[in-house]
Each structure stands twice: as C-alpha cells, then as structure tokens.
Amino acid sequence: MIEAAAQLYCVPEVEYTLQTYIVEGRQVLVATIEETPHKPVYAKDETGKPLAYLRIKDENILATPIHLRVWQQSDSPRGELIRYTEREQLLLDQLEHGTLLSLNRYCRQTGLSRRAAEHLLAKFVRYDIVEPVFENHKFYFRIKDE
C-alpha cells in the first residue's frame, strides 16, 4: 500500500525506506520519507486533483499559493531582479512593528491584487526578508529574525 501511494499518488514519486520491528510480539512497520530537495511534491486528493502539502510538527498542512510561488521561483535557473518601489516599501512598513500579517489583510490594506501580493511576498520569502509563520491553523508573515 505504501509503495502504491508513493508511485501512484505522488508527483514526483517519493522515495522511502521501510523497517520492520517486533514489539511485544507484534510486527511494526516504520516507513521513513526523507525531505525531498525538489519541491513541491503533489499528492492527489479523492478527486484526482494534485495538492502540495507542508509538514509542520507532525501535521500535513496544505501549501499556500505563496509556498508554491517560492518553490516555482527557486527552481528558475535564472535570477530575478527586485525593484524597490512603493509596493515593496509598503510591505516592509506593514511588517515593521513585528506584527503578523495575513495575505488577506495585506491585500485589503494595500489595495493590491491577490496575485501581485502573492508574488511580492514569495519574493521576500525566497530572499529571506520575510518568513511564513503557522499559527492557529493559518499562515501569517513577518520580518525574518536575523
């Protein structure tokens, strides 16, 4: 069953190791899946739709569009120039006081489209300026500690 899940439901296919232990006369199978350097790995849901997840404290959390953009940008072979405009300054101003900022609140307060906000946050996450924080089953963003 583990082999079928790794091959049929994961894109790209994930590698794993299996170990068997005998505990109190019962056989225990431990499957270990190491973190892959090539992200994201998509898992198909019940309808066949591919979804990407993050592993946080033994929980599988659905990846946000920002995570997907960070991974997409990281796989790009060429670099990307960041222009420092009012939009970038506005984001830094929003995060300046150490407050946690949600994507929705950022869009509302700045009037940016969701797509533009995702793109900008992904760039800042990719370059270690901003970090995602998972709190109360929701992602927020803050200036990354040095």
PLM regions and their residue ranges:
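Conserved N-terminal catalytic/coupling substructures associated with nucleotide/phosphate chemistry
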Residues: 1-146
